[in-house]
């Protein structure tokens, strides 16, 4: 039996260095689950490591992709066979077959459709944990990269948690109608004056951009406010020390590394229920061989759909 996978064997732009390769399927390893993948989304966290941005811990040759959903096809225990799971910490999810340690397999309830389950890990869990660590009930909140999946979840769930006002910094004007419909106060990324003004009013900032935008906000936040940095979509670092406060960083992998398996598995019980009540972009499904088209959609400014690879 053969496996098909998207590999990168050197750093570079994903469109240039990813290759779809067919290789013989390795022998099954006892103690793991062999998962036949159904869908995997295209996220910034899938593509950024390919460029070499995290070369201190992620390096080629490697299969791309960090999340997705599939069905268990082989296991030591027959009770696993046929169950849908998220195979976390496997060897890359942009492939037809993933071998996953049993403790890192998250069962998916029957009520959750594949296209939602496939994107049920990185962005939802990060947003949920940040709001758990930095609760926002009764507070004013600002999110950057407001059109991104994680920021969209943060904004929705902040309002659900009882945030007073939620501001969203956007880049593409195509995002404006959706932000207004969601009750988010929109701030154009080009309007530094309004961003600075809003920063002076808010209690918590969830920032995925970094660079000059993070620096601008840090310079205008009051001494009781908090800025949580969870990404660098700008590709530019910034000094975490502002005039009044020091930025705090959130990394999902760091949280999982110090959390007992039983505890974080339990988080998903709450997360699945919440996701079923949450607005998400429609999926645009591409066959694995159409991965270039999936990346092209991902790059479109103001896109309204989430690209998924059908594996």
What are these regions (language model features)?
Residues 185-192, 285-290:
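Short acidic-hydrophobic, aromatic-tinged amphipathic segments that line or gate anion-handling sites
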Residues 259-311:
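C-terminal hydrophobic helical "lid"/dimerization subdomain
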Residues 191-200:
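Short amphipathic alpha-helix with an adjacent loop that forms part of the alpha/beta core around
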Residues 120-189:
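Mid-domain Rossmann-like dinucleotide-binding core that forms the NAD(H)/NADP(H) cofactor-binding site
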Residues 84-146:
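NAD(P)H dinucleotide-binding glycine-rich loop of Rossmann-like/cofactor-binding domains
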Residues 212-274:
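Glycine-rich phosphate-binding loop and adjacent beta-alpha segment
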Residues 24-42, 51-92:
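Glycine-rich beta-strand-centered segment in the early N-terminal region that forms part
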Residues 169-173, 208, 231:
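N-terminal Rossmann-fold cofactor-binding loop
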